Amino acid sequence: MKAIDPDLLLRAYSIGVFPMADSRAADDVYWVEPKKRGILPLDHFRLSRSLAKTIRSDRFAVTADRAFGEVVAECAAVTSQRPDTWINPAIEAAYADLHRRGHAHSIECWREGRLVGGLYGVRLGGAFFGESMFSRESNASKVALAWLVARLRAGGFRLLDCQFITDHLQSLGAIEVSRDDYVALLDVALGVVAGAGAAGGVAVAGAAAGWSAPDFFALDGGATDPDTRTVSGPISGCTIVQLLGQTS
C-alpha cells in the first residue's frame, strides 16, 4: 500500500480534490472532485432548540485535538450501521501526518471519560475540510459539529467543506453548490481572491470584516501552552450556543 505524500494531499485540497478508498482493505486510493459539493455556511448553522438544550446542559465534555488518532480510528471502524468505510490505512496515516504538522484537527465528545463522538478534518488557510464524524451516543456528532462551527467562526474561517451532502448535514444547515461555485468559495477562503464578500452566491463568513490569519485555537483565548491549546476546558455549552446565535 503506497503512502500518500502529505504535501501532495494539501495541494489537492487547495484545488478542491480529496482522496477516498473503495473500502477499509483497499490498497489503492482515488481522487475525488464532486460535481456538486456540500458546504455548511458558517453564518447559517441550524441550531435547533433541542440541540441548543443539549449543548447548554454540558452533557458531553468537548475537547479539540485531545484524541485525534482515536477519532480517525472510530470513523474508520466497521460497525453494524456502517459495514464498510472509505478510510484505508494509507488515508489514516496521511491524516495523522497532517495532524502532526498542524494541518488536521479533531473535535471530541466525552461522557464519563469515554470517547463517544467526534469528527476530524483538514485546515488550510481559511478553509476547514470536514472529513468524517462518528457517534456512540445520541447527538454526540451534532454537538461536535456545533462546537466546530463555533470554533471556526471565532477563529475567522471562511469555509466549512462537507464534501457530500447528507440528510444529517442538511438538517444542520448544509447546502449543495456547483463545482464552479465551490472553487470560487475556496479561492476566497484561501486568500486567492481577497476582499470579496461573497462567491458563487453564498456569503463568506467574515470576508467583509478584513483579512486576518484564521486561528483554529482562538476560541481557547489564545492559550500558548500546548496542553491548554488543545482542550476546550472552561468554555461552557452556553457560550457555544451564544456564539452560534439564535435557535430555530
UniProtKB/Swiss-Prot annotation:
Q: Which domain of life is it from?
A: Bacteria
Q: Where in the cell is it found?
A: Cytoplasm
User: Might you give the EC number(s) for this enzyme?
Assistant: 2.3.2.6
Q: What class does this enzyme belong to in the EC scheme?
A: transferase
Instruction: Give the GO biological process terms.
Output: protein catabolic process
Q: Which reaction does it catalyse?
A: N-terminal L-lysyl-[protein] + L-leucyl-tRNA(Leu) = N-terminal L-leucyl-L-lysyl-[protein] + tRNA(Leu) + H(+); N-terminal L-arginyl-[protein] + L-leucyl-tRNA(Leu) = N-terminal L-leucyl-L-arginyl-[protein] + tRNA(Leu) + H(+); L-phenylalanyl-tRNA(Phe) + an N-terminal L-alpha-aminoacyl-[protein] = an N-terminal L-phenylalanyl-L-alpha-aminoacyl-[protein] + tRNA(Phe)
Q: Where, if anywhere, are coiled coils annotated?
A: none
InterPro entries xref list: Acyl_CoA_acyltransferase, Leu/Phe-tRNA_Trfase, Leu/Phe-tRNA_Trfase_C
| Record keywords, A-Z | Acyltransferase, Cytoplasm, Transferase
Instruction: Select a single GO molecular function from the record's annotations and give it.
Output: leucyl-tRNA--protein transferase activity
Please tell me one Gene Ontology term that the record gives under cellular component. cytoplasm
Q: What biological function has been recorded for the protein in this entry?
A: Functions in the N-end rule pathway of protein degradation where it conjugates Leu, Phe and, less efficiently, Met from aminoacyl-tRNAs to the N-termini of proteins containing an N-terminal arginine or lysine.
Which NCBIfam families does the UniProt record give?
aat
- What's this protein's family per the entry? Belongs to the L/F-transferase family.
Q: What is this protein called?
A: Leucyl/phenylalanyl-tRNA--protein transferase
Which organism is the protein's source? Rhizorhabdus wittichii (strain DSM 6014 / CCUG 31198 / JCM 15750 / NBRC 105917 / EY 4224 / RW1) (Sphingomonas wittichii)
